[in-house]
């Protein structure tokens, strides 16, 4: 499996939380004595879901969760034997596949072959641009869970703190999503 896997673990989004990395470390595999045969398939880097075929270990978890849990069938197996690959079903592009962008395939991928597009640099560029007004919206899930990452109790991890942090980073306006939900309720009466 390692001979067909891009082992650039340091820069991988799953580094430290990768099943293959864990197994390789547990078995004390440091060097790969086999010739690397990494196949890279083209992918639209503008799409919110990023697929890196060079990391795919063909475990089929994405295929199963998309079909059985979401009922969408975006992913499918192509080829047989050593030529087996996981790709968008029906020889379509991901844009044509009716992907709901639910993130289930990303969550179930054990090796980082599927991930969310990282727009961090774009955000920093927008904040640095004096001609742009940057607005941030904090979703309820983030509002309730962000303190966990920093070891803060629920009393310490307030909405005000995260909104203040966004303002200090340079965001012009920061809103809690519940604000817009309240406006909608008031509008619709």
What are these regions (language model features)?
Residues 1-95:
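Ferredoxin-type iron-sulfur electron-transfer modules and their immediate structural context
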Residues 16, 79-86, 95-103, 114-128:
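Terminal amphipathic helices with adjacent charged low-complexity linkers/tails
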Residues 53-54, 89-100, 111-114, 150-157:
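Alpha-helix capping and helix-loop boundary segments enriched in small/acidic/polar residues
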Residues 55-58, 101, 185-188:
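Active-site-facing alpha/beta catalytic cores
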Residues 59, 69, 77-80, 89, ...:
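Generic beta-strand/beta-sheet core signal
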Residues 61, 71-72, 104, 110-111, ...:
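Short coil/turn connectors at secondary-structure junctions
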Residues 115-189:
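Iron-sulfur-associated redox domains of electron-transfer enzymes in respiratory
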């Amino acid at each position: 499996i390692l001979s067909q896997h891009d082992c650039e673990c340091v820069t991988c989004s799953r580094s430290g939380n990768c099943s293959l990395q864990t197994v390789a470390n547990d078995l004390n595999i440091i060097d790969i004595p086999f010739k690397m045969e990494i196949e890279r398939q083209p992918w639209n880097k503008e799409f919110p879901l990023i697929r890196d075929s060079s990391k795919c270990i063909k475990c089929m978890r994405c295929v199963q969760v998309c079909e059985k849990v979401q009922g969408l069938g975006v992913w499918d197996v192509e080829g047989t034997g050593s030529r087996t690959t996981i790709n968008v079903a029906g020889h379509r592009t991901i844009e044509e596949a009716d992907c709901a962008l639910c993130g289930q395939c990303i969550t179930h991928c054990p090796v980082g072959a599927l991930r969310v597009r990282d727009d961090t640099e774009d955000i920093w560029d927008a904040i640095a641009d004096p001609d742009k007004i940057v607005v941030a919206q904090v979703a309820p899930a983030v509002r309730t869970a962000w303190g966990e990452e920093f070891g803060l109790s629920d009393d310490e991890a307030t909405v005000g703190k995260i909104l203040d942090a966004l303002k200090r980073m340079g965001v012009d306006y920061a809103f809690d999503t519940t604000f817009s939900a309240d406006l909608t309720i008031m509008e619709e009466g």
